[in-house]
Amino acid sequence: ILVLPGDGIGPEITAATLSVLETADRKFGLGLRIESADIGLKALQAQGTTLPEAVMARVPEVDGVILGPVSHYDYPSREKGGINPSGELRVKFNLYANIRPCLSRPELSILRKPMDLVVVRENTEGFYSDRNMFAGSGEFMPDPDLALSVRKISAAASERVARAAFRLARGRRCRVTAVHKANVLKLSDGLFLREVRKVAAEFPD
């Protein structure tokens, strides 16, 4: 497992994550091998880039990566070594499904009934410029009091993230809820919903 602590609270968060992994490793004999590398501002200071080539080369060689938060808004331009590690990793390795489990713990008090769900979010498109633009921010201000933003939704990306969700659901409770606003965003969310329904037809269970 490659640990990339990142910036700000990143080292603190990844250290806590590692303590959990190390406990699990001791209890279950997982045989985990942990290594770490610098990215972000620390790497920029030492190596002149926020994402060293050696790190990118190492990622496909390991079984998993723990990436801490990064302060990419504090980075210099790309020409001066400022590369957003999370965005670059997402694009380079086609990390299209952002999978977020939400599970309540029986030993902790909760306000609502127990929760056990997984959010599957498309991770390569949308409003963020590193997901929808070859160059530029994807935002425009025709005048000082008006801001516009471009959103990208494609059939291919919608189909594959839907398939990931249905495959995941098949191993759980066989239930998928598509979150959308197709009643208003008829073209973009309508396209997304159309692809989800196509995939749903392949999973009658």
Segment roles from a protein language model:
Residues R33-A37, R100, T177:
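General small-molecule cofactor/ligand-binding pocket signal
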Residues G6-G8, I39, V70, S104, ...:
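Short, ordered loop/turn segments at secondary-structure junctions
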Residues K27-E53:
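N-terminal beta-loop-helix "entrance" segment that forms/cooperates
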Residues L30, M115, F203-D205:
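A short helix-to-beta-strand connector/capping loop
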Residues G31, V65, R175:
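Residue-level detector of anion-binding/catalytic polar loops
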Residues L44-F140, L146-L148:
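N-terminal glycine-rich phosphate/adenylate-binding segment common to multiple enzyme folds
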Residues G6-G10, G40, G68, G126, ...:
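Glycine-centered flexibility sites
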Residues L2-D25, E139-D205:
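Glycine-rich phosphate/diphosphate-binding loop of Rossmann-like nucleotide-binding domains
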